[in-house]
Amino acid sequence: MIALTPRQIADITGGRLVHPEDARVATPVDGTVETDSRLVTPGSIFFALRGEVTDGHLFVEAATSNGAALVVAERELETTAPLVVVDDGVVALSRLAAAVVEHVRRLGRLKVVGVTGSNGKTSTKNMLRAVLGDVAPTVAPQGSFNNHVGAPISMLRIDETTEYLVVEMGASGPGEIARLVDIARPDTGVVLKVGLAHAGGFGGIEGTRAAKAEMVTDLPATGTAVLNADDDRVAGMASVTAARVVTFGQGASADYRASDIDVSASGTSFSFEHGDASRRVSLRILGEHHVMNALAALSVVGEWGVDLDRAVTVLEGVTRAERWRMEVLDAPGGVTVVNDAYNASPDSVAAALKTLAQITGPDHRSVAVLGEMAELGEYARDEHDRVGRLVVRLNVGQLVVVGHEARHIHMAAGLEGSWDGESVLVDTIDEAYDFLQGTLRAGDVVLVKSSKSAGLRLLGDRLAGVTA
């Protein structure tokens, strides 16, 4: 973070210094901003936030023991570090992030890109980090730091040397992306896809569309909206932005295009076209859906003047997004596990199942281990039903459905024609593990996919013998 004194931070956040006479309030701090006391290192700023599970105020002593140079809290506490008291910790965090981004922007070098969409945000963010980081100092979040707390923390990682800031913007309800846009004020906004992820919080897919459109509605006329031309709901956002519109997709009208896509167990390749230029791109990332993520990243960097040949070379070196995202693992006994269970939505499950079918050779068996897709609200039954039918239509050899909330996948597979044990329903991860241990054989390719809350990512690790 840029260096600021506790007094300056109090002014920015609208807070109150508890001991303004302390000489340390005039000493600049420039450490990381943390909300988890375990991540605090000497010089960090600790924001004590109240969460759904615990309260950061309970860990102020731990934070100062780890070297916190400043504590921002919602009430007075006994602490050895300077203390700023604010009315709302999340609002204070947002104000600080906005001020830091604006300060660095005024230096004249910083460009900010915001990325949103029902699927693909983290993968696209990682691609942008790789390409832009090859060009100049770049800050992008680790993991999925994309909500009202994680995104501002990521923004606060920048300093005066940062030239590119990549902000992943997620939401589970209306207005959340707009608030993040107001903090970061991106020069470029990317919308990847509108799907049913978190549909329960948006009131349906049209509510999701409106929420994702918040990314581009407030972009300045000097900015750029990068839109998926293959998704009608995203392409239609061109009518609600004052920014210049750039498109990506597989259609001939897209500004950045992909064709001739090939998916194998070693990765995904496609022909990339922009203007009159064309070249083959070979990604080491598994899944056809990553082609659109790569196109989005290439659209951003291309419009920012990065040499596209250089960008492609960097992308071809990217291996995977994060843990549990199409992570290919060699399991004991000659079994391949594709652990994609960080999260799940109807679109991402369909894409993962399609990839499973594409990479499993004719002499091997495909196995899908599926759990609940959470936060679908009234769409839950129908969407789980569709997944079950898709499994059968893709000729997946064995389906294992884990958990009561996912039962409609199993039931639909039976109605679609799965029989003689091709689909089984178990209640727990332990039961799934025991069943798979008894049925898996050399050459099997196993997809593990569920929402994070279902915990199947841990089953995928267990099957592959991963312990950390």
Which residues are covered by each model-predicted region?
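ATP-dependent carboxylate/acyl-activation modules
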Residues: V115, K121, G133, R323-E327, ...
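Non-catalytic positions within long, well-ordered alpha-helices that form the structural scaffold/packing
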Residues: V60, T64-S65, V181-D182, V392
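Active-site beta-alpha connecting loops in nucleotide-dependent enzymes
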Residues: V53-T54, E322, Y342-S418
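Acidic, Mg2+-coordinating active-site environments of NTP-dependent enzymes
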Residues: A10, R16, A73-A81, T188-T336, ...
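Phosphate-binding loop of NTP-binding sites
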Residues: A92-A229, A235-T241, G438, R462-A468
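Residue-level signal for inorganic ion chemistry
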Residues: I9, S44, A63, L96, ...
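Short, basic phosphate-binding NTP loop
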Residues: M1-G114, S123-D134, L156, R323, ...
